[in-house]
Amino acid sequence: MSLNPRINEWTGRVVWLVGASSGIGLATARQLHDRGATVVVSARNAAAVEAFESSHPGSLGIALDATDRDAMKQAAERIVARCGRIDFALYCAGHYAPMRASSYDLDEMLRHESVNYVGALYLLDAVLPVLIRQKSGHLSLVSSVAGYRGLPNSLAYGPTKAALINLAQTLYLDLHPLGIGVSVICPGFVATPLTARNEFKMPALIQPEEAAREMLAGWAAGRFEIHFPKRFTRVLKALRHVGDGLYFRVIRRFTGL
């Protein structure tokens, strides 16, 4: 069942991706540009943003820190001034460092909150007035299967991704009646600079290009939650529905932690 308007045609759509200097964000920006979208990329890495703009004619690069509220607002104003509207906004900025309770680091916890969750709130603050005024558009937040239930090494990361899932669900309830689409992306393991920090063999690891294709397919199907690769994510989705005792036993057995 389609929960959002299906997006099959990207030509001329103004798409803003925050966190697009590498990994999933960069791969998605490239594929959207190839499909004719007017792509705006933002990230802290100014050199990467400039490189994308110079190599993708018609695109716009705006370097910013996702944790800078004023910069996010100014970027949205710049996009509207240049393009007249924002049709699609994707928040894919992220921070990840493995953490367990025995090595609790409050500063690192708050860094995860700032980048992964509060940055998304800053994007909403910048684009929601535009989308509501337009009575059209789409918001998409990149969460993770780590947001489904607690996982070892995900003490800092997992709660921020769970918050994004809840945020997207609530946004959908509020914005769908206004004609605005909302989706949440829940990837498994994708080969990015963030997952490179893991010291274990990641099951069902995929490349960012495959992740981007899955996302575009999900938007084309009008899905609310887009999760992949399904050979891995379906298992974790099923585990959301088992009792706590069984869940903890299964996770300990398969992770060894």
Where are each of the predicted segments found?
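Substrate-binding pocket helix/loop in short-chain dehydrogenase/reductase
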Residues: R100-E113
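Active-site helix of classical SDR
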Residues: L124, T160
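Residue(s) in the substrate-gating loop at a strand-loop-helix junction
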Residues: S144
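C-terminal helical subdomain
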Residues: V184, F200-V235
